[in-house]
Amino acid sequence: MTTDWNFEATYLELRDIFYDRGPIHPVDNPTLVLFNDALAASLGLDAQSLKQDIDLLAGNRQTETSFSQAYAGHQFGNLTMLGDGRALMLGEHVTPNGKRVDVQLKGSGPTEYSRGGDGRAALGPMVREFIISEAMHALGIPTNRALAVIQTGEAIMRQGPKHGAILTRVASSHLRVGTFQFAAGAGSIDDVIALTEVAIKRHDPDLIDAPNRYEQFLGRVVERQARLIANWQLVGFIHGVMNTDNMFISGEGLDYGPCAFMDTYHPETVFSSIDREGRYAYANQPYIGSWNLARLAETLLPLLGETKEEAVDVANKQLTRYTELYKEAYFTGLAHKIGLFVRKDGDDELTDELLRLMMETEADYTNTFRSLTLGEIESLPFATRKDGKVWLGAWRKRLNGQGLPDEDVSRIMRQYNPAVIPRNHHVEKAIQAAERGDFGPTEAILTILRDPYNYDQSSEYVSAGPPRTYPYQTFCGT
């Protein structure tokens, strides 16, 4: 185990329109309040040494490889030039086994791209990101992860004074659809080519010498996003702000500000306070994924064909695969969630009917599948309805047709149905306690969420449904 970071910065091989290397903005009284020992170990770093020297994670020490990224983004459908307005990339850490990851500080102070903001972050949203990213990782869904949260000792203004904080975020890269939009809008075709080559080298190195590598690269991004969004849908996750600057080329999730997990099932569920039109509602997420990928394809058109018509045909060939790939991943996953492990004709209709019953009876999304997994049929809110009994009979008949013992079906179903998710009211309680200086509830919920498929846990976080006394709203915390 090493105590040293091994930073490089291949991103800086791009033209300097892609980044800013401005000064750091130190804080006077940093305190480490959350740390991810397991992540540190996976990066080949000694956790204790990092905890004892927090100046780097507090943004008080600059690296030779640090920079802030420029990018654009369609925010609720409107294209805007953006950039890391409150983030500093420390560099690309290369682990002892050769894996390359970005290490970024969020809330580290103003940059060239701050647009008048203070560049800081509040403690509550950083704790939320830490919790949600760890939950997503444990669920097996590709995601950036949080290494640490530093409380800065400074107050910042966000609808009143809040504790300032800095999150250390680790990701396969921070290349976004919005990075390509920036290259196409503020740069030249040569800049788009250079960025694409960097992305291929980083995420799809097997394509480096492929003659049609740009088309294949687009196809790889399509595949990764189709799988990611299908996985979100399968656990009832609502991102809340699926702007193009929040879509990673790597296929990892990022920016867990206004996100939440669905309690009561309804396809039109929206949590984000700023999504007034429901653009990023649960049911819309697959379509927004397709829309965002079309924006990526637009930036790559000059690389995809000799003529515009040829390029559009090539792009459309890859984009049309998205719906097929998404549906395959989603409906296969949904079948697994109800114990069907080889899909047959009629299975999609069976799962569709289940979702209709869940919506009409205001069933809890996670607990419905948990009850089916455990065979606790009487706890289902539609169990006594006529159409509910019809569905349960059809489901049982389909299960029996597989020829597997019930205990084997239940055991396998547990691999697809988490016993616990980050319940919104529990996350809020942890955040509120953290804002009072008590991080015990955060550590407690993290312990549970890091083992989400463990049905043997005895905890209030596992089986307790949400209170129905208020509509839950999330805020980005910017």
Swiss-Prot record:
Gene Ontology molecular function: AMPylase activity; ATP binding; magnesium ion binding
Binding site for ATP: G83, G85, R86, K106, D118, G119, R169, R176, D255
EC identifiers of the protein: 2.7.7.-, 2.7.7.108
Substrates-to-products reaction catalysed: L-seryl-[protein] + ATP = 3-O-(5'-adenylyl)-L-seryl-[protein] + diphosphate; L-threonyl-[protein] + ATP = 3-O-(5'-adenylyl)-L-threonyl-[protein] + diphosphate; L-tyrosyl-[protein] + ATP = O-(5'-adenylyl)-L-tyrosyl-[protein] + diphosphate; L-histidyl-[protein] + UTP = N(tele)-(5'-uridylyl)-L-histidyl-[protein] + diphosphate
Catalytic residues in the record: D245 (proton acceptor)
Manganese is among the record's keywords: yes
Cofactor: Mg(2+); Mn(2+)
Keyword field contains Metal-binding: yes
Keywords recorded for this protein, A-Z: ATP-binding, Magnesium, Manganese, Metal-binding, Nucleotide-binding, Nucleotidyltransferase, Transferase
UniProt binding sites for Mg(2+): N246, D255
Function: Nucleotidyltransferase involved in the post-translational modification of proteins. It can catalyze the addition of adenosine monophosphate (AMP) or uridine monophosphate (UMP) to a protein, resulting in modifications known as AMPylation and UMPylation.
Family of this protein: Belongs to the SELO family.
Family matches, as NCBIfam families: PRK00029.1
Entry protein name: Protein nucleotidyltransferase YdiU
